[in-house]
């Protein structure tokens, strides 16, 4: 009878832990729903509080997670929709609306350049087209890249996945493959594939995760996420899209990461994408010293690093733009 009682106690304890885990998942979903239903003024105040730097031509915003840059049929609020009000609240009621200079994915945080004039916006956009803007990202990944530093030069294209849950994702389109005999063969890259080049280096690793610095040379959709997940087998923490190829499912981090973060598998569904645009370097309008714009890591990102026992980097540790 004692053994049966002990088993019942363990069963009750496991049930209680499962209920607590499911409650936390529901609470996280409720917070996200509450944020989505918040009045516009809440989004406006949040965006205004994230203005990192400004001058007569440009404004640098540390974009928060979950706020899309552009609107759409299913998007109620975006950075673009807030720009007229942001300009008036920040610079006065006679201020002209700010202009978007580039994109940043909804779930990516960090440096977003806004222009105060049309001329400044066009100048930044031209520099981006001519690859004169150097971008640096920090990503918290599952696993550790091997090698720890290098260059990924693998084209990317959109493909339809196989399996019962067919959908479209960006995917690698390698120039080479290994034959059954072990020989390296060159393959023809489809015309729909885009050149994609990323420099990377590992800044620190612990608890089954690593902090990686990324220097994208090109700007293909989801380039960093695809290169890390499919090129290095190190998906970004919270990347529920590219952690699985043929199915739509939440990311399942390894046990070592879950233990360090104090999470269960159900709770890991609410993890946000840990990808941050930390620095943008662009040419100055008068041809003098380049303009370096930096945005510190958000609190949630730094909190995750502490739990994983990965030392948080400082902005001074950033490598300078490559000269080649």
UniProtKB/Swiss-Prot annotation:
It holds the Pfam family PseudoU_synth_2. The keyword Cytoplasm applies. Residues 1-11 form a transit peptide. GO terms for biological process: mRNA processing; pseudouridine synthesis; RNA splicing; rRNA processing; tRNA processing. SUPFAM superfamilies: Pseudouridine synthase (SSF55120). Keywords: Cytoplasm, Isomerase, Mitochondrion, mRNA processing, mRNA splicing, Nucleus, rRNA processing, Transit peptide, tRNA processing. It is found in: Mitochondrion matrix; Nucleus; Cytoplasm. Its main location: mitochondrion. One of its GO terms (molecular function) is tRNA pseudouridine synthase activity. GO terms for cellular component: mitochondrial matrix; nucleus. It is an enzyme of class 5 (isomerase). The active site is at 105. It catalyses: uridine in 5S rRNA = pseudouridine in 5S rRNA; a uridine in tRNA = a pseudouridine in tRNA; a uridine in mRNA = a pseudouridine in mRNA. Its EC number is 5.4.99.-. Catalyzes uridine to pseudouridine isomerization (pseudouridylation) of different mitochondrial RNA substrates. Acts on position 1397 in 16S mitochondrial ribosomal RNA (16S mt-rRNA). This modification is required for the assembly of 16S mt-rRNA into a functional mitochondrial ribosome. Acts on position 39 in mitochondrial tRNA(Phe). Also catalyzes pseudouridylation of mRNAs in nucleus: acts as a regulator of pre-mRNA splicing by mediating pseudouridylation of pre-mRNAs at locations associated with alternatively spliced regions. Belongs to the pseudouridine synthase RluA family. PANTHER family: MITOCHONDRIAL RNA PSEUDOURIDINE SYNTHASE (PTHR21600), PSEUDOURIDYLATE SYNTHASE RPUSD4, MITOCHONDRIAL (PTHR21600:SF83). This is Pseudouridylate synthase RPUSD4, mitochondrial. The lineage of its organism: Eukaryota, Metazoa, Chordata, Craniata, Vertebrata.
């Amino acid at each position: 009878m004692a053994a049966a009682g002990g088993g019942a106690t363990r069963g009750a304890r496991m049930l209680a832990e499962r209920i607590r885990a499911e409650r936390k998942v529901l609470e996280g979903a409720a917070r996200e729903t509450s944020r989505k239903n918040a009045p516009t003024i809440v989004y406006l105040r949040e965006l205004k509080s994230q203005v990192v730097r400004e001058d007569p031509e440009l404004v640098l915003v540390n974009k928060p997670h979950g706020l899309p840059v552009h609107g759409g049929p299913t998007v109620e609020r975006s950075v673009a929709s807030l720009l007229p009000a942001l300009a008036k609240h920040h610079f006065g009621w006679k201020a002209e609306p700010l202009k978007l200079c580039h994109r940043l994915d909804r779930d990516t945080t960090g440096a977003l350049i806004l222009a105060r004039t049309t001329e400044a916006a066009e100048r930044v956009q031209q520099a981006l087209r001519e690859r004169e803007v150097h971008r640096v990202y920090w990503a918290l990944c599952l696993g550790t890249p091997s090698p720890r530093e290098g260059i990924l030069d693998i084209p990317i294209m959109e493909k339809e996945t196989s399996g019962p849950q067919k959908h479209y994702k960006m995917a690698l389109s390698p120039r080479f493959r290994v034959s059954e005999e072990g020989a390296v063969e060159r393959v023809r890259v489809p015309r729909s594939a885009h050149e994609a080049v990323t420099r990377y280096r590992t800044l620190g690793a612990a608890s089954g995760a690593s902090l990686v610095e990324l220097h994208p040379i090109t700007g293909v959709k989801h380039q960093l996420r695809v290169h890390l997940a499919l090129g290095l087998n190190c998906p970004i923490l919270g990347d529920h899209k590219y952690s699985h190829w043929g199915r739509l499912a939440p990311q399942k981090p390894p046990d070592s990461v879950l233990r360090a973060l104090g999470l269960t598998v159900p709770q890991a569904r609410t993890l946000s994408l840990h990808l941050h645009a930390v620095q943008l370097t662009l040419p100055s309008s008068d041809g003098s010293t380049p303009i370096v714009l930096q945005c510190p890591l958000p609190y949630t990102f730094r909190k995750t690093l502490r739990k994983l026992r990965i030392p948080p980097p400082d902005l001074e540790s950033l490598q300078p733009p490559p000269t080649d």
